[in-house]
């Protein structure tokens, strides 16, 4: 893996002070960046806070939901972070999921069209002008890509792409789609960074690590975008069973095979996780963004263990 970044978010067991501590530890360990996820928190505001407590490490969002903010407001927020952090910010953009957006009363329309329009407005605003930031800002825009059309769009108009839950075969396929999109946009794909978001469950007890991993995949496999991608990647049987389970959570968990876990997550001992990370990050992946979930220990211990295990 060329570079490794840490991913984190504000949770009951990871308050702001912990995020600052982890970011500093990741910086000292040679990690390339810290990416904030967006789960009932503001990923951009959190990135600014972490930037003010670090010196060199990149700050990013993985991802910021484009449906929650007007593009011009998003441009001003992101430009402010870029200015305060000395140009260390990467804005990762995603559409979220129909299931979560509809719960907020958001009608998504056509996500691909919305993403294209958002990036266009962002680019124009970031160049300055009446609706743009106080000063023009050079800001890398990374697009979360799951489906083939969104990955191609990232190649056409983005500075990078963020993959998540991608088995190695899907990574290889998606890198080809990214190159196709770059060709459409008249761009060199070498200038578009491909990143892989990888969730880790680290424990010397493999079965203990697989239990929470199974629960995670039973939830994400039920989502349309991820479920379709996993089914397309050779896990049709598992996804069909997860969807058939409906609200029966136990049945959905049982439908997740060890093969699906190993193809999409980092699970097991520190040595096994390092090996799996190398296998998941095919040639062409520039940065692995690792998010850690604890296994029979508190989150702080789990995150610090991950930082030590993946020290650059």
Predicted regions and their residues:
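Active-site-adjacent structural elements that line small-molecule/cofactor binding pockets in enzymes
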Residues: 1-312
